[in-house]
């Protein structure tokens, strides 16, 4: 899942 808010994926 990725978060455009922090720009990271896990």
UniProtKB/Swiss-Prot annotation:
Keyword Transcription regulation: no
Keyword annotations from UniProtKB, A to Z: Amidation, Calcium channel impairing toxin, Disulfide bond, Ion channel impairing toxin, Secreted, Toxin, Voltage-gated calcium channel impairing toxin
Primary site of residence: secreted
Signal peptide: none
Disulfide bond sites: 2-9
A cellular component term, taken from the record's GO annotations: extracellular region
Localization of this protein: Secreted
Keyword Disulfide bond appears in the UniProt entry: yes
Tryptophan amide: residues bearing it: 10
Tissues with expression: Expressed by the venom gland.
Molecular-function annotations in GO: calcium channel regulator activity; toxin activity
Function in brief: Concentration-dependent partial inhibitor of Cav3.2/CACNA1H (IC(50)=1.18 uM) and Cav3.3/CACNA1I (IC(50)=0.49 uM) depolarized currents. In vivo, in a mouse model of post-surgical pain, it produces antiallodynia for both mechanical and thermal pain.
Misc. comment: Pro-4 adopts a trans conformation.
Protein name: Omega-buthitoxin-Hf1a
Organism: Hottentotta franzwerneri (Alligator backed scorpion)
């Amino acid at each position: 899942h990725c978060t455009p808010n922090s720009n990271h994926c896990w």
